[in-house]
Amino acid sequence: MLKVRRNLITITLAMVGIMMSTSHAKPDLTTPVDMSMLHAKDTGYRFVHHTFMAPAPQIPYSGKPDLQTKTAQSYAKPRHYQVWLGIPEQPFAHKPANHASLPNKIIYMLDGNAAIDDLDKDRLYALSHSSPQNAAPILVFIGYQTPYRFDVDARAYDYTPPLLLTETGSKNAFQEDGRDRLNGGAEHFYSLIENEIKPWVYQQLGTKPKQEAIWGHSYGGLFVLYTLFKHPEAYEQYFSADPSLWWQDGEMTRYWRAYQDMPESHPSEQSKITQLRLTFSQSPKQTTTPVTVEADVATPLSKQAFAEEVCTHFKGSCRYQFFDQSHGELFKTSLLESLDSL
């Protein structure tokens, strides 16, 4: 009888463990985000809100009938964004004549709804009351017009890069492997940030901060790396959290190889110092090196190999760390760490 009870306890604990790991692995897509913190007093920040829109992705004929299906077309919708700008109140309340104490650091956070959801009043207050020598950062949350943490279809397009051109490749939208949703809109999303979101931010601030940073997780981490490899001048600091290196059989490895071939990628040729922070979970899916079927492309790298190669290239300007956490858990951990390191 005792043995039976022990077996039942073991089975129950195992089932609980599975349920917990599953809950951490899958993002919450059903619980509305509480935005009340943005209107609360005593956070040390004043928030300004604005909306943006991007046109529907174009799906040109590519010889692949599946791209012309009604299912694919149903994902080709305009994207609607909500952007919250958090301005520290304390430095702006004094405004010295030489502007020495005005905030000169700003961070753009992807998946802005979820990022807001993972912060609280105490964290914002602590950020806003940095020392005069280390002014409080300006916060930009780039989210979607949804009551939930994520718009999974919109981010799947916005955050994923176009495929590097090959004989059969294209820089246009394409369907994600094994799914109907669209990928490949990172360059369009980059242009939206540079040409619409950033100018609006500068207008609200009345100045352009000297040090700009960007943070993203998962597909957002891919976008951070894409921006670094294609537009390294866009930011001074890049925070890529558990980037989906497995995506498209390691397409980001190909971008990394192409970046290395650019003369301006070498530290001696860079006009400014670029800092990169990589954080990784112990997710089995991304720990295993993916296998590619093309013989003429670079072999995709594991997370460890990718981090070592990239940080060797950037020398003292790059750091990486593995956390004993799930992919989902690392979202908040990496976000808070990035904010604390500004």
Predicted regions and their residues:
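Active-site machinery of serine-nucleophile hydrolases
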Residues: 113-182, 186-190
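Alpha/beta-hydrolase fold nucleophile elbow
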Residues: 206-217
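Active-site nucleophile loop of the alpha/beta-hydrolase fold
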Residues: 144, 239-247, 283
